[in-house]
Amino acid sequence: ADKEKILAADGLILPGVGAYPTAMAELERRGLVAVIKEAVAQGVPLLGICLGMQILTEKGLEHEETDGLGFIPGVCRPIPASKEQPVPHMGWNDLAVKQASPLTDGLDGQAVYFVHSYFTDVPIQYIDVTADYSIEVPAMIHKDNVYGAQFHPEKSGDIGLGILEKFAGLCKA
């Protein structure tokens, strides 16, 4: 992706599968961190999915401490392992809406698909939706025009498609 296309976009999606340090290193290598920050500062909506949500935080603790994009205060930490809930967290979990946002309408009690070993430890005012997985995992977070979904909406059937449609509605297109 080049700078002009990103800055001209009506919305941005940071997808994700992989590791926090690798993702941030690749964004830096491509010169995209500053461009993404500039686009968000100009009001372009940003949706981070899975790892894309995790790197919205200030730092991650996967393998090593790594600076994130810093859009949402907090740290990405390992999910504590337990006998009842294995890590990685893979599968369907029900959502609990904690506060309304443009993406959360109709999500309370709905099941979505997760694949992750880390969670975003962020202040409560940025947590829109949670899922119970031995701990209360932030499933959706947001601050201003920056949104994150820890689960994979693209793998979550009609519920997930609805979230993506709502995000598209936030974009200028």
Please state what every model-predicted region is.
Residues 50, 116, 152:
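Histidine-centered divalent metal-coordination motifs
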Residues 149-173:
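Acyltransferase
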Residues 1-5:
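A short, well-structured beta->alpha microelement
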Residues 58-134:
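Pocket-forming structural segment of enzyme catalytic cores
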Residues 9:
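An anion/phosphate-binding loop that grips the pyrophosphate of nucleotide cofactors and donors
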Residues 18-90:
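Cysteine-nucleophile active-site neighborhood
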Residues 136-143:
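Short, surface-exposed beta-strand/loop micro-motifs that present aromatic residues
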